[in-house]
Amino acid sequence: MDNCDQDASFRLSHIKEEVKPDISQLNDSNNSSFSPKAESPVPFMQAMSMVHVLPGSNSASSNNNSAGDAQMAQAPNSAGGSAAAAVQQQYPPNHPLSGSKHLCSICGDRASGKHYGVYSCEGCKGFFKRTVRKDLTYACRENRNCIIDKRQRNRCQYCRYQKCLTCGMKREAVQEERQRGARNAAGRLSASGGGSSGPGSVGGSSSQGGGGGGGVSGGMGSGNGSDDFMTNSVSRDFSIERIIEAEQRAETQCGDRALTFLRVGPYSTVQPDYKGAVSALCQVVNKQLFQMVEYARMMPHFAQVPLDDQVILLKAAWIELLIANVAWCSIVSLDDGGAGGGGGGLGHDGSFERRSPGLQPQQLFLNQSFSYHRNSAIKAGVSAIFDRILSELSVKMKRLNLDRRELSCLKAIILYNPDIRGIKSRAEIEMCREKVYACLDEHCRLEHPGDDGRFAQLLLRLPALRSISLKCQDHLFLFRITSDRPLEELFLEQLEAPPPPGLAMKLE
């Protein structure tokens, strides 16, 4: 009898050992078979707790008939199926784990994707990236609880950055992105066959291996390889055809989109009976401002310049670029105004002051469909600028028989200005300008072989452009027709936003 009891006890203990769950693997940090998948949106402990309360595969005939148990029983052994959906329902619609990709977690604007671990818009993505890369510090003027939404996200940078961190944006993701870009550039350099500059490198400073790399390439990057890669890239990208293509596409594809910088507001000093005409002028300029930003984005190598430098370049150049277009379009008014033959009858200083009013050109053309009459300029108090654009620019362009290619090169030279205060990538922008110089010089030699001084004559128009643009800038502040928002902020928003449909242009 005792033997039977011992035999039964042995069998019972053996059965207990067989059915006893092995939890050692759950506690073993080195065992990956029980670790959650990285792509699963459900936290591991929550998923495990949900599996624990699910009915087992052998308990389908359970007496629990609640609706919740019936739904959970559809996938009894899955921690990432209906269990994941149940967990996701606990998050608000704009939470990174909610599965919604439509709202920015920081400001509520439309999200363009998942950036640095969080669904966000292009504006908040760019703001976070700049803050981390430049290691910027902000201060809140209120109580560090400012509202950050689509309308007010730019009011307090401190609270916006804190909300980025609170919503889960990762600083290390920005650094990893920069390191990835450096590795990709090195890979492209290696694939292109080493670090020597091509025959078209700017400034004649190709370096074959060692040495510091002279000319404009010096000081760019930390080594000759990256310098030469950038030199080859600039040389390969630049051509007059590429510049003209960017200009034409911006003119034809932007439609009625505008950058609302100029407006006749309540504090404007424009005379009441003239506000309508000035307002119409502001609308035309605002449309051209939008086109100008898109034109710059498609210009060779412009997209590779740091975003802050892009804003600085555009802010310094926009008035000059606008006046260059106006002067070019207004050449037709010289014939209409009696200044045919390249401006014959002008005074020795090139002005129209000595001419009778009937012979003076009467119109400036901002584009092919909008003109500005001289009488309007007189009433607005800008007749001096009106005459300077015609006498110092339009007349000289007509005498030189300036073609569209030469105009495009002059505008590119204005855009790539390395001498602006605050520019970080000075040598890179200088390299771009040198390449435009080379394109313009080659065009002059091929199209005007007998005119050795043409290249210099074209460049001599740039100081006049600069002088007139400064006078225009003074009038903008005098008449108080600028927006309350800084122009840099408007440029930055457009540069961070996706380009309009039809303007996508691959720039290596």
Swiss-Prot record:
Q: Assembly state and interactors?
A: Heterodimer of USP and ECR. Only the heterodimer is capable of high-affinity binding to ecdysone.
Could you tell me which residue ranges the NR LBD domain spans?
239-498
**Full protein name:** Protein ultraspiracle
Is Cell wall biogenesis/degradation there in the keyword field?
Answer: no
Q: What is known of its domains?
A: Composed of three domains: a modulating N-terminal domain, a DNA-binding domain and a C-terminal ligand-binding domain.
The organism's superkingdom is given as Eukaryota
Say what the protein does. Receptor for ecdysone. May be an important modulator of insect metamorphosis. Plays an important part in embryonic and post-embryonic development. Binds to ecdysone response elements (ECRES) such as in the promoter region of s15 chorion gene.
Q: Where is the composition biased (Gly residues)?
A: 192-224
Q: Which organism is it from?
A: Drosophila melanogaster
The molecular function terms of the Gene Ontology recorded here are: core promoter sequence-specific DNA binding; DNA binding; hormone binding; lipid binding; nuclear receptor activity; nuclear steroid receptor activity; protein heterodimerization activity; RNA polymerase II cis-regulatory region sequence-specific DNA binding
Zinc-finger (NR C4-type) residue ranges come to: 104-124, 140-164
Q: Which family does it belong to?
A: Belongs to the nuclear hormone receptor family. NR2 subfamily.
Q: Name the encoding gene, please.
A: usp
Which parts of the sequence carry Phosphoserine?
A: 35
Q: Name one Pfam family in it.
A: Hormone_recep
